[in-house]
């Protein structure tokens, strides 16, 4: 008897192929098509993106860490059980924890800003839907009255979902967690675009389940930040935050992103110590006009009012364009 040969795996189920160098193009496309399908199903069209450090903890977490370190230091002093090297490391850990305590206000303020934006976004979605319904009725009446068969009543965009703008973060701890937390406190949905890292950045618990994503490729993750983003908020952070800020600024400066996108740089004192934007302009590395791409802010209320006014202005401009260009 001839032995029955096992079926070969289908290509799209062949894990060995999918994880090989030859399967890279499929993996890249998957990180475009799968998020696109899920976001469309959730009716997410516009986001407000929060960038910032994963290391900025909540005041409660920092206080607990600092207390634990000080207790360890006190116990070691009583027993004289630490070497000079370990004692110096403990002292440095306490110094860092004290610095993190100063920065922890950004966690609270990030959560508050996300809450304010989400509450406004939910209210705006309902208001926009009502306006769109009126506009549709008026267009339909005009179409009959004036006998204009080509007027497309559906050209008036509606945002019938419950949230006009959805808060989007990198999905991890720190400022990312604060953003998702604030959105949840407001009763809204929020997105987490996580990234697989060697030290395992786990998704925070405040992300909406169906909007929790995990990326392998940084550039595909960045694409979704930029593509859906209608406003950016940059909180204090390290290399990753700097990379995200400057990539978005470069795309806007060079016209690769053609949409108007308000950018709030949050924490003036921190950022002016890290980057001297004025000196970049002084040396001619950027233009004076480029400085207008950034709005510095130091309170949730100021950042909220700026983003709200800018997005409202841009939204009304789009609405006017659509009403005057029914085939757009």
Model-derived features with residue positions:
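Short, acidic/small-residue loops that bind anionic groups at enzyme active sites
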Residues: 189-200, 235-236, 249-277, 288-289
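Glycine-rich beta-alpha loop segments
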Residues: 2-11, 15-189
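C-terminal functional extensions of proteins
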Residues: 265-328
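Short, solvent-exposed amphipathic alpha-helical segments in soluble enzyme
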Residues: 65-68, 184-185, 247-252, 279-282, ...
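Solvent-exposed alpha-helices and their adjacent loops that cap or buttress functional pockets
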Residues: 40-43, 157-162, 184, 204-206, ...
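Phosphate/pyrophosphate-binding betaalpha-module
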Residues: 168-169, 173-235, 246, 271
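Glycine/threonine-rich flexible loop motifs
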Residues: 61, 242-246
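Short, well-ordered amphipathic alpha-helices
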Residues: 112-122, 245-253, 275-281
């Amino acid at each position: 008897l001839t032995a029955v040969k096992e079926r070969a795996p289908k290509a799209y189920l062949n894990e060995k192929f999918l994880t090989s160098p030859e399967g890279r193009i499929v993996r890249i496309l998957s990180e475009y098509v799968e998020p696109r399908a899920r976001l469309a199903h959730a009716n997410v069209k516009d986001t407000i993106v929060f960038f910032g450090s994963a290391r900025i903890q909540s005041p409660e977490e920092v206080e607990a860490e600092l207390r634990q370190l000080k207790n360890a230091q006190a116990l070691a002093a009583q027993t004289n059980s630490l070497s000079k090297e370990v004692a110096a490391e403990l002292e440095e850990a306490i110094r860092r924890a004290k610095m993190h305590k100063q920065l922890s206000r950004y966690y609270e303020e990030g959560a508050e800003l996300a809450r304010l934006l989400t509450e406004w976004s939910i209210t705006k979605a309902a208001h926009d839907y009502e306006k769109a319904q009126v506009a549709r009725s008026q267009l339909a009446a005009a179409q009959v009255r004036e006998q204009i068969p080509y007027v497309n009543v559906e050209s008036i965009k509606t945002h019938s979902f419950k949230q006009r703008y959805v808060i989007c973060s990198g999905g991890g701890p720190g400022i990312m967690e604060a953003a998702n937390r604030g959105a949840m406190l407001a009763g809204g949905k929020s997105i987490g675009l996580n990234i697989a890292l060697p030290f395992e950045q786990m998704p925070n618990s405040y992300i909406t389940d169906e909007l929790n994503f995990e990326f392998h490729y940084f550039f595909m993750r960045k694409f979704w930040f930029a593509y859906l983003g209608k406003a950016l908020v940059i909180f204090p952070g390290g290399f990753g935050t700097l990379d995200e800020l400057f990539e978005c600024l470069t795309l806007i400066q060079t016209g690769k992103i053609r949409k108007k996108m308000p950018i709030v740089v949050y924490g003036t004192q921190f950022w002016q110590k890290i980057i001297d934007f004025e000196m970049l302009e002084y040396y001619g590395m950027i233009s004076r006009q480029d400085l207008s791409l950034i709005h510095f802010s130091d309170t949730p209320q100021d950042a909220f009012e700026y983003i709200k006014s800018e997005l409202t202005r841009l939204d009304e401009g789009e609405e006017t364009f659509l009403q005057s260009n029914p085939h757009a």
